[in-house]
């Protein structure tokens, strides 16, 4: 998809701050510093729309981005960062649970994982959470450029088996460096969104 417009609309922490809109939404989740911001910037053809932080756990709000006036991307705070306090972690959990369980506009989630490593227990927990609430999920296995092409399938198998990926959910090999998987990611997103304008 050609992205001609991408703007941040609001950073929200509670439902009354969510955009008053019927546009479909795609939530983007992933471990702190897994490469989620780089994925968003790459797929939207923007260098710095989402700030890439050297400090994990920096995003503490739900950031809504309006894409081509036709859908919202919702950047969810990264999880699994050890230095976040228990109270912050509890607030984070409540905020995302409220969003995922009450937002009717949510069509699917994108879960970004690092292809180089076996998904963590936090990744498994996040995927299980999404499946518990029957949210269609696209798994973006990023940093594919850091692994020899001949080993991609072996690493993908580990991701699939560790997460116990359900039938119907898609896994896309991705690289924010080379752009590998960009078209496939958009195809998967359009498959789940109510808007079919490619």
Swiss-Prot record:
Record key words, sorted: Cell cycle, Cell division, GTP-binding, Magnesium, Metal-binding, Nucleotide-binding, Septation
Residues that hold GTP according to the record: 30-37, 57-61, 75-78, 142-145, 174-176
GO molecular function, one term: metal ion binding
Transmembrane annotation, as ranges: none
Entry cofactors: Mg(2+)
Gene Ontology biological-process entries: division septum assembly
Annotated Mg(2+) binding sites: 37, 59
PROSITE patterns: G_ENGB
InterPro entries xref list: G_ENGB_dom, GTP-bd, GTP-bd_ribosome_bio_YsxC, P-loop_NTPase
PANTHER family recorded: ENGB-TYPE G DOMAIN-CONTAINING PROTEIN (PTHR11649:SF13), MSS1/TRME-RELATED GTP-BINDING PROTEIN (PTHR11649)
Family the UniProt entry places it in: Belongs to the TRAFAC class TrmE-Era-EngA-EngB-Septin-like GTPase superfamily. EngB GTPase family.
Name of the molecule in the record: Probable GTP-binding protein EngB
Gene that produces this protein: engB
């Amino acid at each position: 998809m050609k992205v001609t417009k991408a703007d941040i609309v609001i950073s929200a922490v509670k439902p009354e701050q969510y955009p008053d809109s019927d546009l479909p939404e795609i939530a983007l989740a992933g471990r702190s510093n897994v490469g989620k911001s780089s994925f968003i910037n790459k797929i939207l053809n923007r260098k710095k729309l989402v700030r890439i932080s050297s400090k994990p756990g920096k995003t503490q709000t739900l950031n809504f981005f309006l894409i081509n006036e036709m859908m919202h991307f919702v950047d969810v705070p990264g999880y699994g960062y050890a230095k976040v306090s228990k109270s912050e972690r509890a607030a984070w959990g409540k905020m995302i649970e409220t969003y995922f369980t009450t937002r009717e506009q949510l069509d699917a989630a994108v879960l970004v994982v690092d292809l180089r490593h076996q998904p963590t227990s936090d990744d498994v927990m996040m995927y299980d959470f999404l499946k518990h609430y029957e949210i269609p999920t696209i798994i973006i296995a990023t940093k594919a450029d850091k692994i020899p092409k001949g080993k991609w399938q072996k690493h993908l198998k580990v991701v699939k088996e560790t997460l116990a990926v359900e039938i119907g959910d898609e896994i896309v090999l991705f690289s924010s460096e080379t752009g590998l998987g960009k078209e496939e990611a958009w195809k998967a997103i359009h498959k789940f969104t109510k808007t079919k304008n490619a």
